[in-house]
């Protein structure tokens, strides 16, 4: 589709040029207007062309076909830091890009999905080409070496750039240090608890920057870290910097600055605070019975400090906080999202913990959780479950918008935040505005 503004600009140009369209060659008057018309029209067509999609769901608006279990699976350039790249593209360009996306394309940007192996396969290529997904998450079983990871990421990024209007993928890993270290080429670093015991924020910042630079070398642009949970509860343990929110706050903020120095998207997690939970959300839904005063004074301060330090993404956990919302876990709760936006003051990208975890699946299917999370205000959804569940979740969100259960404005707001994040950290100069 031709940009209406460009058509207006073209019409104005033609009016100006028509007056000066007669020149003399060999002393004979020649009209250049037909030639000018042809060149300008060709210029518009070239400028607005987009690579064809193969039976794109975005072009048809139909619900994606369901893949079956029988279907067989078949060096990004160094990016500038956030401060360097923030001025590469006018701020209003993200809104323009959002307006150019179909509903199906926009919804796809909200999904960060798991990959099945160590190289691109039919399913992940289908998710990129036909659902326009916003990112992938890589686990230890996806990454054998830096070179293999780099090759896989490069191939998937090229596919995304080709098929989604030059929008790159979020490529996320869990690389916290200690026992949560999924990238085998990254130098081992001690767990957060050991770093916290040092009491030295400079150490936290240095470690985060080293991790970030080593991830970046393989094309990984997002770390689902740091953990800014306070306390050593179930599933967290030594992943936390400590049980003192003041200590966790300064260590977490330092880690955010370290990732920022490396040009990596960091993620403060798990809001409101998994460190106080007695149950692991991978296996069940934790209930944290803190009153609101404790939430405000103990659970939230590290997240506030991370936001003040410039963290671009916050992960909401599968945690039931009755003082916040007695019915829904934070990842599916409008009240929890509102608390994060208004009380903590975060205006960046909110991403859910993996919707394939039992802590949320006990309350329904992955597709149902996806609709609830988007309705609650989450911007991005992590889904590491099998391809069929990923496709079902995507289709459910698209259907939810079409049926009026999710507002189009909410989708647009989320995708605008996602594209601003990508513009700041990921977009290459070759992509243009």
Describe each PLM feature range:
Residues 14, 18-35:
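Bacterial N-terminal signal peptides that target proteins for export
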Residues 157-187, 207-227, 248-272:
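Glycine-rich, aromatic-flanked loop segments that form ligand/cofactor-binding clefts
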Residues 182-187, 221-239, 243, 269-285, ...:
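Active-site-proximal loop/short-helix segments
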Residues 102, 144-161, 165, 247-405, ...:
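Second-shell residues forming the walls of enzyme active-site clefts
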Residues 198-210, 246-249, 295-296:
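Glycine-rich anion/phosphate-binding loops
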Residues 4, 47-66, 71-79, 83-131, ...:
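Preference for extracellular/luminal or secreted protein segments
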Residues 29-52:
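Sec-dependent N-terminal signal peptides of Gram-positive bacterial secreted proteins and lipoproteins
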Residues 109-115, 134-137, 169-173, 223-224, ...:
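Hydrophobic faces of well-ordered beta-strands that scaffold small-molecule active sites
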């Amino acid at each position: 589709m031709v940009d209406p503004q460009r058509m207006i600009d073209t019409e104005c140009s033609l009016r100006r040029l028509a007056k000066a369209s007669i020149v003399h060659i060999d002393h004979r008057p020649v009209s250049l207007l037909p030639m000018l018309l042809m060149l300008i029209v060709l210029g518009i067509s070239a400028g607005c062309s987009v690579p064809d999609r193969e039976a794109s769901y975005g072009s048809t608006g139909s619900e994606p076909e369901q893949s079956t279990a029988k279907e067989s699976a078949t060096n990004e350039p160094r990016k500038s830091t956030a401060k360097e790249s923030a001025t590469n593209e006018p701020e209003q360009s993200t809104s323009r890009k959002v307006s150019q996306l179909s509903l199906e394309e926009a919804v796809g940007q909200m999904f960060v999905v798991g990959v099945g192996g160590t190289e691109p396969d039919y399913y992940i290529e289908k998710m990129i080409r036909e659902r326009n997904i916003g990112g992938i998450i890589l686990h230890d079983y996806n990454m054998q070496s830096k070179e293999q990871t780099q090759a896989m990421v490069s191939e998937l990024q090229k596919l995304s750039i080709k098929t989604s209007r030059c929008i790159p993928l979020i490529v996320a890993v869990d690389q916290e240090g200690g026992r949560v270290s999924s990238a085998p080429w990254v130098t081992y670093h001690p767990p957060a608890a050991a770093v916290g015991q040092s009491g030295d924020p400079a150490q936290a910042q240095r470690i985060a920057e080293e991790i970030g630079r080593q991830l970046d070398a393989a094309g990984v642009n997002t770390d689902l870290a740091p953990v800014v949970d306070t306390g050593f509860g179930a599933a967290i343990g030594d992943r936390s910097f400590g049980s003192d929110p003041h200590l966790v706050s300064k260590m977490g903020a330092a880690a955010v600055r370290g990732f920022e120095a490396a040009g990596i998207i960091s993620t403060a997690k798990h809001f409101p605070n998994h460190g106080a939970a007695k149950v692991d959300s991978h296996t069940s839904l934790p209930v944290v019975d803190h009153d609101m005063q404790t939430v405000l004074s103990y659970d939230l301060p590290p997240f506030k400090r991370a936001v003040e330090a410039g963290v671009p993404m916050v992960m909401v956990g599968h945690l039931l906080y009755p003082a916040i919302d007695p019915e829904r876990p934070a990842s599916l709760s409008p009240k929890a999202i509102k608390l994060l936006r208004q009380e903590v003051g975060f205006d960046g990208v909110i991403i859910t913990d993996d919707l394939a975890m039992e802590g949320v699946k006990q309350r329904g299917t992955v597709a149902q959780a996806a609709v609830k999370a988007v309705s609650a205000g989450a911007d991005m959804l992590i889904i590491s479950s099998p391809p069929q569940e990923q496709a079902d979740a995507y289709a459910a969100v698209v259907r939810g918008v079409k049926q009026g259960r999710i507002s189009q404005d909410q989708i647009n707001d989320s995708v605008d935040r996602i594209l601003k994040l990508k513009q700041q950290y990921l977009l290459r100069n070759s992509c243009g505005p």
